[in-house]
């Protein structure tokens, strides 16, 4: 396939960016931001803290989105000028610079196009992710830890801060489970389709006969709770247990009972936190995780009712979504979107944007049915 002419490529980027601006309705966003700025300037705003939080949060989001789109428009205009300059002066270094900026601009517009699909009620939230080892023994525990690293590397590549809330180590190697937050807007919307079972096929490094092993790990993604969600948990509905934090191989890492396990009695949901320094901090974090799980449970119940009215079924937590084959060949393939790559090393190092973008489109198509 012949490479696209730079001028045609720039026209295509201009058309796509104009389409994004139309979908987002930039003039309406500016009007709403101006109205919220007037509200934020009102000295009496914080007389109602909940409304104040809503106003300031929405204003911050709108301002960031407007800056992002306006910044892309300016970058596109600058690249056009750069190409004109390179051609007028027959300047190859300037042309090379313009081509590199055009490639970066295309990636930024690709990302923004995906962002326009994230219009669900909770899509703009931060993501709370839990990874659990499933069938496969020590290989499954090792696989769960590999997945944890994959998602942390993905977040790092995008500059998203992460916070590990809890890690339960397996006896021999790997982890039984881990929970972490990705502290960036829209990461719930981006990662929601990662929810499900991930299957690994490889030669087991723990088998002295070097046999092929299949192992499974589950990924659970829920939105981080906000105060406006009103997830109230009465004290008589929970049981709180404390224990000592443990590290790899079951080794104790704390001499005090600072780790906290909270059981929600009506639902049986159990959450733990042992990564904070004090029992009080661990309890507060565990309660936040429990609230997020209850919010997701409420959301799933509402989705199930809607699906029942439509005569549909909802995807269960245990649904296998992706295969990672390292032997006898190299292939990562998503079973829903059909996206695949032989670059298994890159995927396991966090290069999963192609899968995440396709997952966003797949989820939006399902929700529009």
UniProtKB/Swiss-Prot annotation:
<dbReference type="InterPro" id="IPR005139">
    <property type="entry name" value="PCRF"/>
</dbReference>
<protein>
    <recommendedName>
        <fullName>Peptide chain release factor 2</fullName>
    </recommendedName>
</protein>
<keyword id="KW-0488">Methylation</keyword>
<dbReference type="InterPro" id="IPR045853">
    <property type="entry name" value="Pep_chain_release_fac_I_sf"/>
</dbReference>
<comment type="function">
    <text>Peptide chain release factor 2 directs the termination of translation in response to the peptide chain termination codons UGA and UAA.</text>
</comment>
<keyword id="KW-0648">Protein biosynthesis</keyword>
<dbReference type="InterPro" id="IPR000352">
    <property type="entry name" value="Pep_chain_release_fac_I"/>
</dbReference>
<comment type="similarity">
    <text>Belongs to the prokaryotic/mitochondrial release factor family.</text>
</comment>
<dbReference type="GO" id="GO:0016149">
    <property type="term" value="F:translation release factor activity, codon specific"/>
</dbReference>
<dbReference type="InterPro" id="IPR004374">
    <property type="entry name" value="PrfB"/>
</dbReference>
<feature type="modified residue" description="N5-methylglutamine">
    <location>
        <position position="251"/>
    </location>
</feature>
<dbReference type="GO" id="GO:0005737">
    <property type="term" value="C:cytoplasm"/>
</dbReference>
<dbReference type="Pfam" id="PF00472">
    <property type="entry name" value="RF-1"/>
</dbReference>
<keyword id="KW-0963">Cytoplasm</keyword>
<dbReference type="Pfam" id="PF03462">
    <property type="entry name" value="PCRF"/>
</dbReference>
């Amino acid at each position: 396939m012949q490479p696209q002419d730079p001028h045609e490529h720039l026209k295509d980027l201009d058309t796509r960016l104009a389409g994004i601006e139309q979908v987002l309705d930039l003039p309406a966003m500016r009007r709403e931001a101006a109205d919220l700025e007037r509200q934020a300037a009102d000295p009496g705003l914080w007389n109602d803290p909940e409304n104040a939080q809503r106003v300031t949060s929405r204003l911050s989001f709108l301002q960031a989105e407007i800056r992002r789109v306006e910044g892309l428009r300016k970058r596109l205009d600058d690249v056009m000028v750069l190409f004109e300059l390179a051609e007028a002066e027959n300047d190859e270094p300037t042309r090379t610079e313009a081509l590199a900026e055009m490639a970066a601009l295309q990636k930024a517009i690709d990302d923004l196009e995906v962002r326009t699909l994230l219009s669900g009620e909770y899509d703009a939230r931060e993501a709370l992710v839990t990874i659990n080892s499933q069938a496969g023994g020590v290989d499954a525990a090792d696989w769960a830890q590999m997945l944890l690293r994959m998602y942390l590397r993905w977040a790092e590549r995008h500059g998203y801060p992460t916070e590990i809330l809890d890690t339960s180590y397996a006896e021999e190697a790997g982890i039984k489970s881990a929970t972490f937050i990705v502290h960036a807007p829209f990461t719930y919307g981006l990662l929601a389709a990662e929810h499900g079972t991930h299957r690994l096929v490889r030669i087991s490094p723990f088998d002295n006969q070097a046999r092929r092993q299949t192992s499974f790990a589950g990924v659970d993604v829920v939105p981080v709770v906000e105060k406006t969600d009103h997830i109230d948990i009465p004290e008589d509905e929970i049981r709180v247990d404390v224990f000592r934090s443990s590290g790899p191989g079951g080794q104790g890492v704390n001499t005090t009972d600072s780790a906290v396990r909270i059981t929600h009695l009506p639902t049986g949901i159990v959450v733990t936190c042992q990564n904070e320094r004090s029992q009080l901090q661990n309890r507060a974090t565990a309660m936040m995780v429990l609230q997020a799980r209850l919010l997701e449970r409420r959301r799933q119940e509402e989705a199930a009712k809607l699906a029942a009215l439509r005569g549909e079924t909802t995807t269960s937590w245990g649904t296998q979504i992706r295969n990672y084959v390292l032997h006898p060949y190299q292939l990562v393939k998503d079973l829903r979107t059909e996206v695949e790559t032989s670059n298994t090393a890159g995927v396991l190092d966090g290069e999963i944007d192609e899968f995440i973008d396709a997952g966003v489109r797949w989820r939006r198509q399902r929700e529009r049915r």
